[in-house]
Amino acid sequence: VYEKLVYGDAKHVCISSLSKEAYEHTIVINGMSKAFAMTGWRIGYSAAPADIAHGLKDIQGHTTSNGVTFIQWAAIAALENCDDDVAYMVEEYKKRRDYTFNRLTAMRGITCKNVDGAFYLLPDVSYYYGRTVNGKEIKDSFDFCSYILDEAHVAIVPGAAFNAPEGVRVAYTNSMDKIVEALDRMEKALAKIQ
């Protein structure tokens, strides 16, 4: 779902393109939610060898209902006509990523690797674990996120949910104005931690 959301010289490589054998043994399952901003519409597609595709169709047909017709048409239109829109969105996300990365890494105790794709960063905030604020200890990413939500009114996601207990997931999908405001609030909240 992130194959179109790559920055700079980074390229998405589908495993099926590596060799004929890989092609014959690869199942691609993809969705429209990220690259085409169709989150919540729950529409996607699969590509696989014919025998597997028939099995997938049978499973899907017995576990979920079909997507609403207008959503199916919207997905087709997105795949056929939205390359320029996606390219614009990627450029905007790159600007927001760069700004968010620079702001986060300038904050006391936060380290972060930059990313070549997607629309979120996963900074390491473990510097704050074991520290206290308002009489409460920050023990983990859940406590850290709760504090930031309560104090700064900024929603971030515990990294533990992504097998990264030292980190938090920070999305940069909002407008630049909102990102600036959120990071300003977050920085002020971090300054209060002892």
Give short role names for the model-derived ranges.
Residues 1-194:
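PLP-dependent class I/II
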